[in-house]
Amino acid sequence: MRHFLSLNELTKDEILYLVDLACRLKSEVKRGFFFPYLKHKALGLIFTKASTRTRVSFEVGINQLGGYSLYLSKNDLQLGRGETIEDTAKVLSRYLDLIVIRTYAQSEVEEFAKYSSIPVINGLTDDYHPTQIIADFQTIFEEKGRLKDLKIAYIGDGNNVAATLLVGASKLGLDIAVATPKGYEIKKEVVDFAKDEAKRSGSNLIFTDNPKEAVKDADVVYTDTWVSMGQEEEKEKRIKDFEGYQVTQELMKLAKEDAIFLHCLPAYRGFEVTPEVIDGPQSKVFDEAENRLHAHKAIMVFVCLGRI
């Protein structure tokens, strides 16, 4: 039994294993095979943030693996009325077999895991989004046939997705260029962690405020919304601050000819990306979204059973 709270705790080999397992599980489904690796296992989903892809993919995923799910809104639990995280974790550990938490503070997920005797999976916090990045790496592997000798360019807000992508790339030895406006950089402690990983893996890390510099000769161009959940009051300011950071056809032309475009969704066309890019032939965003299902299954199997 283990938790899945961020990519920081995973080794390169474990990340590659999860990608491989996700591909295998996807192949099984495509061939009509559903193996009950988690037969009769109960998955609890505790969400305080809205969700489309994370919730649906985990619920469908545990079903495909032979288990079942319970959606537990924070307001439906005594947790929403002041019961401690410690007590909630200890009680739910007696009923469930694994838990996915989607909330604001990373500290809440870590505290829950501290007192839980069953695996806890981080379904998204303000700091990290590790389940998403496993699906991203799966998509890149499917498109490029490898997870080495590649350059990723991330354009936009240095948010939870950017931070996790940076950590993952630095562990795998992938080059990554991050272009953010001043004031929206990835947190220093995450950058420092990635730099240490890059020394071991050979990753080339570039941090700039120039999207054109970041995208030059990239194999993958990635962006995310400029206004994340909980930042709605900052919308007008953020739209102004991110002027020039939109992924356009012109920007994509600076990447390699066979570069792919990724976005974790939801996307806001006309803001962080133009319709021509996200709906164009280089876009793999819906393959990426589909892979959330199989990546999440791989993560659930991994935390419950280890390697299979």
Swiss-Prot record:
Gene Ontology biological process terms from the UniProt entry: arginine biosynthetic process via ornithine; citrulline biosynthetic process; L-arginine biosynthetic process
Catalysed reactions listed for this entry: carbamoyl phosphate + L-ornithine = L-citrulline + phosphate + H(+)
Localisation per UniProt entry: Cytoplasm
Recorded superkingdom: Bacteria
Binding site residues for L-ornithine: 160, 224, 228-229
UniProt-recorded name of the protein: Ornithine carbamoyltransferase
GO cellular component: cytoplasm
Residues binding carbamoyl phosphate, per UniProt: 51-54, 78, 102, 129-132, 264-265, 292
Disulfides per UniProt: none
The EC number(s) this enzyme carries: 2.1.3.3
Principal location listed in the UniProt entry: cytoplasm
Pathway in which this enzyme or protein is active: Amino-acid biosynthesis; L-arginine biosynthesis; L-arginine from L-ornithine and carbamoyl phosphate: step 1/3
One Gene Ontology term of the molecular function aspect: amino acid binding
Signal sequence coordinates: none
Lineage: Bacteria, Bacillati, Bacillota, Bacillota incertae sedis, Caldicellulosiruptorales
UniProt keyword terms in alphabetical order: Amino-acid biosynthesis, Arginine biosynthesis, Cytoplasm, Transferase
Species of provenance: Caldicellulosiruptor saccharolyticus (strain ATCC 43494 / DSM 8903 / Tp8T 6331)
Protein family according to the UniProt entry: Belongs to the aspartate/ornithine carbamoyltransferase superfamily. OTCase family.
InterPro entries attached to this UniProt entry: Asp/Orn_carbamoyltranf_P-bd, Asp/Orn_carbamoylTrfase, Asp/Orn_carbamoylTrfase_sf, Asp_carbamoyltransf_Asp/Orn-bd, Orn/put_carbamltrans, OTCase_ArgI
